[in-house]
Amino acid sequence: LATDLITNGTTRVCMFSSLHTDATLVLMDELERAGVTGYVGKVNMDRNGLPGKLQETTEESVQETLRWLDACHFEHIKPILTPRFTPSCTNELMTQLGKLANERGLYVQSHLSESTNEIAWVKELHPECSQYWETYDKYGLWKDHTLMAHCVWSDERERAAIRDAGVVVVHCGDSNVNICSGICPVRRMVN
């Protein structure tokens, strides 16, 4: 992967790895040795996954994230906290990740408003939040340099919250077309 990135002219990345700590460290090492710079995140998810395979317990997720952070000694590839998205993280996990982000000065990346079904699901899980973005804000994960993937269905209020907080929208048109989730209103965001 790292060599392919360089061969194709990609020299900077911001990537989701997996919830597996050792695999994430291997990816980071490969990227570092290939000369790629950027951020890689060990994915956190303690609900709505596949228990034992693609889902950790809250305690495992926090402990493995700490182990991963303590092992990150790369010069050009930096760690970024990566709660997969609100539906895959319990309140306790989001609280712990928010503390880590603030204590260690770490950037955060996740998903936001990828589809209307996802937004409805988040409302079911967090009826106390009137908007999806608030589920990150309440845990200290909505801040300057937070990266949010997709943002296809972000309304004017959410776009204002993105702008006001200094959150960065990361959008890949091919990805959203592939999963038929919609087209990000990039022009509205730029204006």
Where are the predicted features?
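Metal-coordinating catalytic core of metallo-dependent amide/deamination hydrolases
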Residues: 22-152
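Short catalytic-loop micro-motif centered on adjacent basic/acidic residues
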Residues: 12-16, 80-83, 147-149, 170-172
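Short, charged beta->alpha transition segments
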Residues: 1-3, 65-71, 158
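Divalent metal-binding segments
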Residues: 1-23, 87-93
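Active-site-adjacent C-terminal substructures of enzyme catalytic domains
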Residues: 141-191
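A structural motif
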Residues: 10, 105, 166-167
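Short amphipathic alpha-helical segments and helix-helix/interface helices
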Residues: 2, 28, 94, 98, ...
